[in-house]
Amino acid sequence: MSMILSVTETLVNNQSISVSGNTISRGKSEHEYLIAYINVGGVAGSNTPTMTVQLQSSPDNNTWYDVESSVVITSAGQNVIRSNNFGKYIRLKYTITGMNPVFSGVSIIINTKG
């Protein structure tokens, strides 16, 4: 069964990430399904550089809760987060670990179905 996704947004566009942070939040109360595409061009550093990307949801755009969907990234490539369990606002939190980690060419795009 194919699904037509109605909205596409780019949250991060071909950037280098070396510290933990969050994408900007988006109001999504009218959407019922989300797919986040996380593309990483390269990974550098020592002690196993890791980027954990966690989908978060909020009822008020102030207090944030982890949703069940996350992905752990240790190498270049494509990764996907899917969810149909989120509130009015969403964002992606990314946590970076390792020694001198750099994740280059990072792009995060979300598609939602309304």
What are these regions (language model features)?
Residues 41-50, 98-102:
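Extended, low-complexity, turn-rich repeat/linker tracts enriched in Gly/Pro/Ser/Thr and Asp/Glu
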Residues 23-26, 77-84:
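Exposed aromatic-hydrophobic patches
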Residues 29-31, 46, 74, 85:
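Surface-exposed coil/turn segments at beta-strand junctions on protein surfaces, enriched
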Residues 32-34, 49-53, 102-104:
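Short beta-strand/loop motifs in extracellular/secreted proteins, especially
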Residues 56-58:
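Conserved Ser/Thr-centered positions that define the repeating blades of beta-propeller domains
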Residues 1-14, 18-21, 30, 96-114:
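C-terminal interaction-tip segments
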Residues 10, 66-74:
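Solvent-exposed serine/threonine-rich low-complexity stretches and specific carbohydrate-binding patches
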Residues 32-38, 84-101:
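Noncatalytic modules at the cell exterior or secretory-pathway interfaces
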